[in-house]
């Protein structure tokens, strides 16, 4: 979905302008979070780190198989467009160009929280130290998801002409539910960090 006459910004954003490209972006962000977890968790228990990475690898392998089987970005296009297919005009907007990566940083970032919690529960590792460690990942995901939702609402308001920033349709609700879950989780972790309670909620 790139085009030779488009600015570089839209050539790059055209990568995730279709279903296959957006799933590739999803895998890229998932890999990025695994790398960041490796860097930021060096002080944590080795078994906990290994088990967290194992759960993350299961997730990424599942997505990889799904992409190859159902949404392969390597399928041939015939006839080959000389200048490129180009991006849908409604998607040629700065807010929407950065909306998917930011939203994915929020969505995919929560996979680290999921894997870490599974690992910590399996090893009985949930403690104040673990709460301090996981809190930063919850906050990162929450911030990016918040920005992504706001960008999507602004774009929908002036581009689609819905007449408002928010409507209770499935497209918007599907991003609101994880945001509410992350907000609740963040507050539970704050309580866990200070009082060592609400472990079952976390």
What are these regions (language model features)?
Residues 1-202:
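Polytopic transmembrane helical bundles with strong interfacial aromatic enrichment
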């Amino acid at each position: 979905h790139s085009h030779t006459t488009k600015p570089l910004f839209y050539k790059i954003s055209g990568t995730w302008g279709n279903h296959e490209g957006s799933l590739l972006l999803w895998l890229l962000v998932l890999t990025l979070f695994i790398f960041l977890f490796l860097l930021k968790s060096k002080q944590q228990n080795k078994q906990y780190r290994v088990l967290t990475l194992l759960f993350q690898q299961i997730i990424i392998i599942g997505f990889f198989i799904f992409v190859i089987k159902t949404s392969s970005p390597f399928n041939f296009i015939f006839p080959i467009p000389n200048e490129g297919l180009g991006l849908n005009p409604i998607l040629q907007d700065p807010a929407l160009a950065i909306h998917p990566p930011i939203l994915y940083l929020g969505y995919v970032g929560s996979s680290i929280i999921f894997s870490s919690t599974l690992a910590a529960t399996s090893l009985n590792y949930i403690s104040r130290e673990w709460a301090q460690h996981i809190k930063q990942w919850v906050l990162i995901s929450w911030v990016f998801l918040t920005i992504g939702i706001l960008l999507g609402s602004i774009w929908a308001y002036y581009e689609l002409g819905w007449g408002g920033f928010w409507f209770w349709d499935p497209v918007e609700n599907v991003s609101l539910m994880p945001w509410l879950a992350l907000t609740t989780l963040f507050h539970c972790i704050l309580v866990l960090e200070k009082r060592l309670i609400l472990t079952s909620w976390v």
